[in-house]
Amino acid sequence: MKKKLVCAYIIGYGIFPEWYSVLTPCKEATETNCYITWASFKRGYVPEQGSLLVGKTCVNPISWTIDTLPASTSGGMLLSVKAKKRFKSTAQIHNNYLWVKTNTPFVQTWNVLHLMDYNLYWMDIRKNVALRVAEYLKKK
């Protein structure tokens, strides 16, 4: 099964590596046969201990790495399908969850950004899916 998996995007939940005996977290943008996970919080916010959103693994949805270097994107969400402006975000892994800073107006007041785990990085996710699928097909 693992060899047939391009990538599992398990977004918004705390994942513990020991849950998957054959899958490991993705460590780079083109890696296949691995999983990606993150839970988003406002930069500087520390979630409650024991939160179901925080696990032992986090992949940065901009750099697609597991290091703690900050990364920036302008491929974030739109407020509507017709909107032309995309909102910018930065993401940095901190204690196995994602610290986020964004200029998205209504999100700036939230601490827990779980509802926005996909939206903040929708263009980054789309590009990454295409990249991983191409890499997977190249290996076949």
Task: Go through each PLM region and give its residues.
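Surface cap/lid and interfacial helix-loop subdomains adjacent to catalytic sites
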Residues: 1-135, 139-140
